A protein has these predicted regions:
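Helical element adjacent to the flavin cofactor pocket in flavoenzyme catalytic cores
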Residues: 69-88, 181, 188-190
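Short glycine-/acidic-enriched loop or helix-start segments at secondary-structure transitions
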Residues: 24, 47, 99, 141-144, ...
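C-terminal, flexible cofactor-proximal segment of oxidoreductases
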Residues: 143, 147-155, 160-213
């Protein structure tokens, strides 16, 4: 790939630099889990572009909720800046590929615990976990089918089984800001438990812990 800057390894790649992406990045940072946040995903699965324009915003007509959302965003951006969270606002993912971790030379992954290659215009990000934000359920189901995995009724469980987590994703409308924070906390706990299975929960300290849930 022209201009490829090489391959980077991280625990989690978060796709989306909005409220959902920043919330889960801050939660992971608070728990000592590294992540890289990219702006979005231009290709979803093998051949389906990510299209979130059809999703309605639940707060579009609610000025109080919009103010709350903006205040939380401001807080999250300040947290990210002060804690050196790796946010790449001008970088978009152009391909998402599930790979056998053993093929990458790490020797840690198993067929039941694949790794992910996230291609960007400047290189490849290799991660154990992917967090998706603002994608329609129908697109997510197509993506899982493209990977040859039976979805069944529980989309979230099917995706978590292969290391993909959802934050801020709704069927018809986007969740409220407080619901996004709740989802981010749940996903942060799940990923942290995979990374540090023998450690106890991190204490809810720091300014991010004071955000409403």
């Amino acid at each position: 790939m022209p201009g490829n800057a090489g391959t980077e390894q991280t625990t989690t790649v978060i796709i989306g630099t909005g409220l959902s992406g920043l919330a889960v990045a801050a939660e992971l940072c608070r728990r000592g889990v590294d992540s890289i946040v990219v702006d979005g995903l231009d290709i979803l699965g093998a051949s389906h572009p990510a299209n979130t324009a059809s999703l309605q915003r639940c707060d579009a007509a609610d000025s109080d909720t919009l103010r709350e959302r903006n205040e939380i965003l401001r807080h999250l951006r300040n947290y990210a800046a002060s804690h050196d969270v790796d946010i790449r606002n001008t970088t978009r993912a152009v391909q998402l590929t599930m790979v056998d971790g053993l093929a990458l030379g790490g020797g840690l992954a198993t067929p039941a615990r694949p790794q992910w290659e996230v291609r960007t215009p400047t290189g490849i990000l290799v991660a154990d976990n992917i967090v998706l934000t603002r994608c329609a359920h129908s697109q997510l189901r197509r993506m899982i089918n493209d990977f040859g995995i039976a979805v069944g009724r529980n989309l979230t469980a099917a995706m978590r089984a292969i290391g993909i987590y959802l934050v801020g994703v709704g069927e018809l409308i986007t969740p409220s800001p407080k619901e996004v924070l709740r989802q981010a906390k749940t996903v942060g706990q799940a990923i942290s438990a995979k990374v540090n299975p023998d450690s106890g929960p991190y204490p809810a300290t720091g300014s991010f812990a004071a955000l409403p849930c």
